[in-house]
């Protein structure tokens, strides 16, 4: 102890003795005071003549329990007989036993949780989950048509397991199951179901999980309305079918599951197809396909026969011959038109040639006219005026039958009397 009476700081050099730890635990428990606790009775030890009754109170949603002691009269005077599996609310104070380092709850009052209260709690939880959107249809995952492996969570050796396996194998003999047997009622049900659900959800071949139980009372079905289980179903990646088989008060697992089945038998029918029905459907579809194909072939054959009966196909050369005759006629008409056009144009051309000849230079020269050209080196220019041919110019005179070379001796203006050959300029 320190000088002020307090315990020294705890360390490896200054460890607390067990008695100090026990004292601190008792002090903390004393400060906690009396408390209300809810749980499920898993064990009752009520010996005749004993002054103390011993119970074990378990949390339905977790693998945790608490030792409870009480006056035996509290159990005997309970308005509802208390038994293993009963849900209760107790009032008492924790007691620490230093000698063995254990804690027990000394109970002064026990209140059984009735069916009405249980249903009210379920309704409150249902409203909470609905407000969070956990019942939304958009969250529902589709059930595979033919799953590789079906996971099954159910009680060991119960009717639910037998019904699911028998019905499923009768419908599809090759179906495979991964079965996890758990408690389906009582305080251990929820932890075991959660463990099995996690295992099957991780299984690489399990494509759908069936949670099955063959009905029961409200108290028996409480695990399937547990909040932890409902949230685990929503969080799972594998589609889950809830087949608890209880009407009309459905457990909450029915609302959060991807598919609700009325019974385990119904669940087997919903997750596995009926091989006989599928074969019958295949046969029906094959028959319908064959009938449709035959009908199509018949229609096409009739259409082909109609086409073959048409004249153009019955005697295809007839149309070719008719077209050939028409083409030959058109060719003869074309030749006739071309010859007529050539004759017409030839006559017109001859007339034009005659006109050109009559007005052309050669005809004019033939009538005694001449064309006078002044020769300047290699160039020749037609003389149209006396100014174009001054005296001394070299001239070329073209007549009808040739040309004459001459020289200009002089010029005489129009209207001037021409003198004799020796006069003039």
Curated annotation (Swiss-Prot):
One of its GO terms (molecular function) is nucleic acid binding. It holds the Pfam family Exonuc_VII_L. Keywords: Cytoplasm, Exonuclease, Hydrolase, Nuclease. GO terms for cellular component: cytoplasm; exodeoxyribonuclease VII complex. GO terms for biological process: DNA catabolic process. InterPro entries: Exonuc_VII_L (IPR003753), Exonuc_VII_lsu_C (IPR020579), OB-fold_nuc-bd_dom (IPR025824). The keyword Lipid biosynthesis does not apply. It is found in: Cytoplasm. It is an enzyme of class 3 (hydrolase). Its EC number is 3.1.11.6. The keyword Glycosyltransferase does not apply. Its main location: cytoplasm. It catalyses: Exonucleolytic cleavage in either 5'- to 3'- or 3'- to 5'-direction to yield nucleoside 5'-phosphates. Heterooligomer composed of large and small subunits. Bidirectionally degrades single-stranded DNA into large acid-insoluble oligonucleotides, which are then degraded further into small acid-soluble oligonucleotides. Belongs to the XseA family. This is Exodeoxyribonuclease 7 large subunit. It comes from Nocardia farcinica (strain IFM 10152).
């Amino acid at each position: 102890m320190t000088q002020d009476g307090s315990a020294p700081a705890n360390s490896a050099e200054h460890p607390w003795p067990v008695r100090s730890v026990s004292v601190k635990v008792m002090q903390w428990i004393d400060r906690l005071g009396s408390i209300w606790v809810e749980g499920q009775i898993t064990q009752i030890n009520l010996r005749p003549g004993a002054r103390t009754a011993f119970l074990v109170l378990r949390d339905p949603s977790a693998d945790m329990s608490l030792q409870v002691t009480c006056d035996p009269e509290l159990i005997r005077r309970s308005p509802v007989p208390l038994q293993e599996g009963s849900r209760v609310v107790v009032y008492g104070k924790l007691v620490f036993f230093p000698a063995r380092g254990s804690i027990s709850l000394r109970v002064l009052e026990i209140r059984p949780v009735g069916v009405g209260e249980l249903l009210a709690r379920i309704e409150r939880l249902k409203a909470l989950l609905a407000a969070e959107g956990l019942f939304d249809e958009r969250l529902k995952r589709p059930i595979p048509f033919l799953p590789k492996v079906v996971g099954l969570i159910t009680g060991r050796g119960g009717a639910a397991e037998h019904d699911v396996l028998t019905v499923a194998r009768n419908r599809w003999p090759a179906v495979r199951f991964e079965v996890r047997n758990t408690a389906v009622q009582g305080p251990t049900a929820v932890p075991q179901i959660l463990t099995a659900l996690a295992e099957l959800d991780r299984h690489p071949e399990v494509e759908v999980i069936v949670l099955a139980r063959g009905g029961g009372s409200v108290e028996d079905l409480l695990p399937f309305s547990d909040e932890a289980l409902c949230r685990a179903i929503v969080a799972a990646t594998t589609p889950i079918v809830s087949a608890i088989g209880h009407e009309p008060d459905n457990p909450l697992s029915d609302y959060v599951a991807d598919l609700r089945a009325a019974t385990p038998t119904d669940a087997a029918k919903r997750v596995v197809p009926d091989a006989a029905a599928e074969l019958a459907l295949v046969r029906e579809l094959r028959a319908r396909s064959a009938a449709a194909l035959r009908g199509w072939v018949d229609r096409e054959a009739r259409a082909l026969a109609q086409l073959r009966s048409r004249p153009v196909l019955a005697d295809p050369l007839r149309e070719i011959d008719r077209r050939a005759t028409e083409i030959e006629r058109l060719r003869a008409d074309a030749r006739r038109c071309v010859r007529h056009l050539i004759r017409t144009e030839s006559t017109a051309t001859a007339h034009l040639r005659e006109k050109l000849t009559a007005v052309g230079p050669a005809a004019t020269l033939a009538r005694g006219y001449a064309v006078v050209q002044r020769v300047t080196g290699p160039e020749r220019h037609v003389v149209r005026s006396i100014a174009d041919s001054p005296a001394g110019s070299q001239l070329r005179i073209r007549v009808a039958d040739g040309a004459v070379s001459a020289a200009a001796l002089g010029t005489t203006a129009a209207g001037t009397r021409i003198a004799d050959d020796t006069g003039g300029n």
